[in-house]
Amino acid sequence: MNERQLIARVIAGDRLAGRTLYDTHAPRVYSLAYRLSGDAEKAREVTQDTFIRAFSRLAQFRGDAAFSTWLHRIVVTVVSNARRSEVRIAREVALDEAHSIEMTAPEAEPDLKESIARAVDNLSEAYRTTLILHDIEGYTHAEIASMLGVPEGTCKSRLSAARAQLREQLAAFKE
């Protein structure tokens, strides 16, 4: 059974087909969610939220792109919404609690792997997402443009800028 037939069966209410569709795509959805969020628990939540959204909107899937591309666009949206929510909550620290926030001195330079992870985390959301989708997940610029709803040229320039920022932040490791 091909993926279109599987999707049609899920829309018709076939729970086994839904489980098959989930089992087929969940590992890559989780992988992308983990790379974008950097946290296993958040990645599990994002994976769950992604499939809840996908199954509730499955009838809206037109098939213009691959089903996995459509799912990954949902992952990006869910992670982005979660990050915005976290930032909003972080800003809402009460003034009387603000005095208890301590500043710590940066530790000695960790190894390269930790520095790379930190440098990627420091990228803007748009740059980080584009970098992960292209360099780690292996999507083409056209697929990323479709997922993010931006022109292909924007994806290319974001990737170039992300790589330039990483080179700058990791220059200390260059010999």
Regions inferred by a protein language model and the residue ranges of each:
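Acidic, proline/glycine-rich intrinsically disordered inter-domain spacer in sigma factors
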Residues: A90, E97-D121
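Amphipathic, Lys/Arg- and hydrophobic-enriched alpha-helical face
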Residues: Y22-A40, R57, V120, Q169-A172
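Sigma70-family region 2
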Residues: I11-A12, G38, D49-A66, S85-V87
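A short, charge-rich alpha-helical start-of-domain segment used by transcription regulators
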Residues: I7-S31
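Structural recognition of an alpha-helix C-terminal capping motif at a helix-to-coil junction
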Residues: S31, E45-I52, A65-T77
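DNA-recognition helix of helix-turn-helix
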Residues: V76, S80, I136, L148-A172
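Arg/Lys-rich amphipathic alpha helix in sigma70-family domain 2
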Residues: S56-G63, R73-V93, E109, A161, ...
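Helix-turn-helix DNA-binding module
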Residues: M1, R118-D121, E125-T129, L133-T154, ...
